[in-house]
Amino acid sequence: MKIHIIARGRIGRSPEGELVERYMKRLSWPYRITELPDRASNAPLPPAPPHSITVAMDEKGKTWRSMEFAQKIGNWQDEGRSEIRFLIGAADGLREEERAAADMYFAFGAATWPHMLARAMLAEQLWRASAILSGHPYHREG
């Protein structure tokens, strides 16, 4: 199973970019990050491979505790999903065609987060899910 983050805008060399890199390097799954031009561009999403799932990061999405997020990923892995795609929009959010491509929506709570920070938060949650599923002591709940 591959993790694929598809995001609008270039994160470049920034504190958020460093966090994304730090957490993604720790993942046990292979991963790919695709940066698309920002909202002004008509660049389409890369095609979804067969048996993949697409999760749009959106403030109106479902919120999952870290354990629930890990269980979702574990279930998708057990189902033999080829790729889990996470879509992160530009500063103004997701485009209509990006929303339409999503199988589900996930939110980091009710607050609105900057899109570059959302990437870092997603990278951390992916690492946390990997740690939970492997029994690593990184996650402490309670």
Curated annotation (Swiss-Prot):
Taxonomy, superkingdom: Bacteria
Location(s) in or outside the cell: Cytoplasm
Disulfide bonds: none
Any one GO cellular component localisation term in the record: cytoplasm
SUPFAM superfamilies: alpha/beta knot (SSF75217)
UniProt KW Transmembrane keyword: no
EC number: 2.1.1.177
Gene3D superfamilies membership: 3.40.1280.10
Binding-site residues, S-adenosyl-L-methionine: G89
GO MF entries: rRNA (pseudouridine-N3-)-methyltransferase activity
Keyword presence, S-adenosyl-L-methionine: yes
Alphabetical keyword list: Cytoplasm, Methyltransferase, rRNA processing, S-adenosyl-L-methionine, Transferase
Catalysed reactions, semicolon-separated: pseudouridine(1915) in 23S rRNA + S-adenosyl-L-methionine = N(3)-methylpseudouridine(1915) in 23S rRNA + S-adenosyl-L-homocysteine + H(+)
Family under the similarity heading: Belongs to the RNA methyltransferase RlmH family.
PANTHER family named in the record: METHYLTRANSFERASE, RIBOSOMAL RNA LARGE SUBUNIT METHYLTRANSFERASE H
Function: Specifically methylates the pseudouridine at position 1915 (m3Psi1915) in 23S rRNA.
Record note on quaternary structure: Homodimer.
Protein name as it appears in the record: Ribosomal RNA large subunit methyltransferase H
Organism annotation: Zymomonas mobilis subsp. mobilis (strain ATCC 31821 / ZM4 / CP4)
